Swiss-Prot record:
It comes from Xanthomonas campestris pv. campestris (strain ATCC 33913 / DSM 3586 / NCPPB 528 / LMG 568 / P 25). GO terms for cellular component: cytosol. It holds the Pfam family RNase_T. Mg(2+) 1 binds at residue 31. This is Ribonuclease T. It comes from the Bacteria. One of its GO terms (biological process) is DNA replication proofreading. The active site is at residue 189. The gene is rnt.
């Protein structure tokens, strides 16, 4: 399914503009692939972002994906077991990895554009185990001294919680399947694939949820 098509065509839960639906925050799905679990010690290796869009009928759908491979930041570690899980080959000739600052610039630009498009104040990170992604993102932002981070520094929407409530599943693959979405295990643990699947899952849940009649 193309990423710019609505996931669900149920009756709209809300006709509030995006700028009011989530208190001025634009949901943006993020997934990172890393060299381990410690954001202060392990390298950020991949990042992907998908802004959540809204059509004229009030349905949420995934926007365009922005992604980057990253050159491991100097002084950070990479656990070989993490590379086994993700399948990342650091010296692959077609990896085209960017330095951290350039990678953040690349993925932040379309996020800021989407925030502006919908008249929102800032982006809020949506992720599966979202604080893992946010902690690695914030660590990279701090390392390079990035001044234009569009994301809220600590608030998130976590699809682990949402999927647990909606489907009784907390593992991304099982939650996606419970939501009626396709899942390809061979593509999992790619930042792009996991982000796009998480975006579809978020939209599926958000479109089915009875949204507020008004919001501040």
């Amino acid at each position: 399914m193309p990423m710019n098509e609505p996931v669900d065509l149920q009756p709209s839960p809300s006709l509030l503009p995006m700028s009011r639906r989530f208190r001025g925050y634009l949901p943006v799905v993020v997934d990172v692939e890393t060299g381990g679990f410690d954001w202060n010690k392990h390298a950020l290796l991949e990042i992907a972002c998908v802004p959540i869009e809204m059509d004229a009928q009030g349905h949420f759908f995934p926007g365009e994906t922005a992604s980057a491979h990253l050159v491991p930041a100097p002084g950070l570690e990479i656990d070989p077991k993490s590379l086994e899980i993700t399948g990342i080959v650091l010296d692959h000739p077609f990896r085209f990895a960017k330095q951290e600052k350039d990678a953040l610039d690349h993925v932040f630009a379309p996020v800021r554009a989407a925030v502006k498009k919908y008249g929102c104040q800032r982006a809020i990170l949506v992720g599966h185990n979202a604080h893992f992604d946010l902690n690695f993102l914030n660590a990279a932002v701090a390392r390079v001294g990035h001044k234009r981070n569009p994301f809220h520094p600590f608030s998130v929407f976590d699809t682990v919680t949402l999927a647990g409530v909606a489907y009784g599943q907390t593992v991304l693959a099982r939650a996606a399947q419970a939501a009626g979405l396709d899942w390809n295990s061979a593509d999992a643990h790619s930042a792009v694939y996991d982000t796009e699947q998480t975006a579809r899952l978020f939209c599926k849940i958000a479109n089915a949820w009875p949204g507020p009649a008004s919001a501040g």
